[in-house]
Curated annotation (Swiss-Prot):
Function recorded in the entry: Catalyzes the GTP-dependent ribosomal translocation step during translation elongation. During this step, the ribosome changes from the pre-translocational (PRE) to the post-translocational (POST) state as the newly formed A-site-bound peptidyl-tRNA and P-site-bound deacylated tRNA move to the P and E sites, respectively. Catalyzes the coordinated movement of the two tRNA molecules, the mRNA and conformational changes in the ribosome.
Gene Ontology cellular component terms for the protein in this record: cytoplasm
Record protein name field: Elongation factor G
Listed PANTHER family: RIBOSOME-RELEASING FACTOR 2, MITOCHONDRIAL, TRANSLATION ELONGATION FACTOR G-RELATED
Domain tr-type G: 6-282
Major location category of this protein: cytoplasm
Organism classification: Bacteria, Bacillati, Actinomycetota, Actinomycetes, Mycobacteriales
SUPFAM superfamilies given in the database record: EF-G C-terminal domain-like, P-loop containing nucleoside triphosphate hydrolases, Ribosomal protein S5 domain 2-like, Translation proteins
Residues holding GTP: 15-22, 79-83, 133-136
Swiss-Prot/TrEMBL keywords: Cytoplasm, Elongation factor, GTP-binding, Nucleotide-binding, Protein biosynthesis
Subcellular location: Cytoplasm
A GO term, aspect molecular function: translation elongation factor activity
Amino acid sequence: MLKDLNKVRNIGIMAHIDAGKTTTTERILFYTGINRKVGETHDGGATTDWMEQEKERGITITSAAVTCFWDNNQVNIIDTPGHVDFTVEVERSLRVLDGAVAVFDGKEGVEPQSEQVWRQATKYDVPRICFVNKMDKLGADFYFTVGTIEDRLGAKPLVMQLPIGAEDNFDGVIDLLEMKALTWRGVTPIGTEATVEEIPAELADRAAEYREKLLETVAESDEELMEKYFGGEELSIAEIKAAIRKMVVNSEIYPVYCGTAYKNKGIQPLLDAVVDFLPSPLDLGETKGTDVKDPEKVLTRKPSDEEPLSALAFKIAAHPFFGKLTFVRLYSGKVEPGEQVLNSTKNKKERIGKLFQMHANKENPVEVAHAGNIYAFIGLKDTTTGDTLCDANAPIILESMDFPDPVIQVAIEPKTKSDQEKLGVAIQKLAEEDPTFTVHLDDESGQTVIGGMGELHLDVLVDRMKREFKVEANIGDPQVAYRETIRKPVESLSYTHKKQTGGSGQFAKVIITIEPYAPEADELEEGESAIYKFENAVTGGRVPREYIPSVDAGIQDAMQYGFLAGYPLVNVKATLEDGAYHDVDSSEMAFKLAGSQAFKEAVAKAKPVLLEPIMSVEITTPEEYMGEVIGDVNSRRGQIASMDDRAGAKLVKAKVPLSQMFGYVGDLRSKTQGRANYSMVFDSYAEVPANVAADVIAERNGTAS
């Protein structure tokens, strides 16, 4: 564990699925001495892919944290998933990183998920270097890939190396800093060092051209260097590196390297670049947070052991022996096992049991956790993703993370009673780990409904329930939660509930008026509902005071099952105007039944209509797919609200019925070759068009043809 923070790098490896980032990580681990045997994703042996599902699918689902060393520097690596369904893993790892390596496929260039991950990294202002991988692949084109970084990402790539050959003839790279060739000729077993050679004659002119571009970029970044360079003086390697580092830390440029991780070519220079150009915790300076008592007041913490403790929990993972592992980025201060800390987000004290640095799913115990590093804590009971841990005497709340709401939901039903109990435990554990996994009980269907970021996301979660928690369950389709309301008032409807069966009977008479009700939020008194209001207008004691709440309760009961299709009624105001009672036969139950029946009869005359949930949808798409995307939204009964530019793409905002959004994830991907993504949140309820309502009602009532 290094205490010199200048020599610490907290980095992520990010890319589109199949660009080779896990293989790149495996090679880094080998060259830094962590792995004696290298793992491959295609045979299920990769160190960072340690979940059963990852080994089977050959993709990275959870971001595993690994610590390694290179050239006397400590590198903490987070390997992030490239599949869009696991966007939460990318989001939370980027939040705690200081820098990242973006891996691109040398043939495909910038791919859809590369765009999305790049946007996420830009959101958190994470400095990046680029690695063009798979240069040995048929059709690999380094210059095309660099062009896509500029065009698709709107980024400024700084070419640091040129490839020597391509496809089967990829033999190495030209280092544009040292102006030397680094070659790995032929079959290169893992661990093969590069041979340093002169630049091949046929590439000398191109190398000189790109070296000139590099030096011009460096010179333009600094007035002193500009005078020196354009005055004909030579810039030293140290000056060039310092200028590049400064621009990288400020996210002004993105150095580009190349190689083939699988064939063991180009990894060592990439590691040198991580150390040379990506920032240390000290480069990024103070971390900002807010005062617990005054959210408007900004507090800062320097990356130092001497500062009060401030840390962010960015991931929860289940561990077979220790229970819950909480992955934490320590921004300031230090902490030891057994110490008590404050979870300022929840205002709860937590005691730290053990401290580990992780190597994928292996734990290395540490005695002290230092500022600027990433650790796994054991023993935290109440802490969840996004919570701040701090010194109780100097409380602070760090900026948390934004997690998108689930975009797909399915009903899940345990097969047996014993599965029912295990399902509850499984859901609780998985929800702790994953903020984008939601669960709720559908009051109308009685089903447990789980939500996530896509079909693969839910597949993996259901698979984990089976494997880890031994839960057998049936997965179904959820129903849209429709509602009903009324469109016209019905005045003074009289209903008498009368029952005589010997002895004391039942008697209650009510006269009610119902009307549509949709108040603005600022019109509501504290505790009032926006979807129902009851008013008592009875005078002269014609309905005794003690029976008034029973009428209200009866109406609320009746509202649970609407007139058209049995969906709950909303946005109704009911007024009790008059009534009558009997000294002996009236009771709370009689008035409750009278209120309920009167309301049902009134609703039947009040022009009842069906309402459906409308979602506010945001779609980010490359401009060339705008026509397809908008046409598709319109075909789903959607209404376009706005279209704006965003980070080299277009942002479409629309209102679309939820019933039309099932299967959208797949449709959007296929229409845009996977290059668009979307999020949606509930917006409001709106009336269902008559022709659609007729079908919904018929299906609900079992009369569909």
